[in-house]
Amino acid sequence: VGLLLSNAGYDLVFADVADALIEGLQNSESYSVHEVGDDPRTTVVRGYSALNSAKQAAELTDAIARADVVTTAVGAHILKFVAPAIAAGIAARPAGAARVAVMACENAINGTDILKAEVERNYSGDDLADRALFANTAVDRIVPAQAADAGLDVTVENYFEWAIETPPFEG
């Protein structure tokens, strides 16, 4: 999903609690996505930042408050742990700002509904619907087992599909 958003012109901010991953991203100007299959190619992703969500909570809140899109790819069982940070970022959005699109890109049916319920539990205001929209997604991209020495680089199959429900964007 990061590659797709980067190719669409979005600035990426990665957030995780894994020190080694975040430090690696912070200390590198780029990472490569190796697409394998009928039309193999390598794309270098640049222009991103990375935050340790356990150690840089204020910075993460600010990043979410300024974001156009927030996606997760952590596993459906982890959504309850990332929801407080997302709720804090939504609450910090300036009044009148466009709604942030929140999408859980998980291997779960209606993963965004799961995330939305967790965000609602952590959101104290009554204006969540004015500040955020939540759209379920289905991501179809096979990510084979990665080589132990791959570092930040990732190998994926070149076929992909990212279906996003449209009703939350209507109106």
Language model features with spans:
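Substrate/ligand-engaging "lid" and interaction regions
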Residues: G2-T61, R66-A67, T71-V74, I78-G171
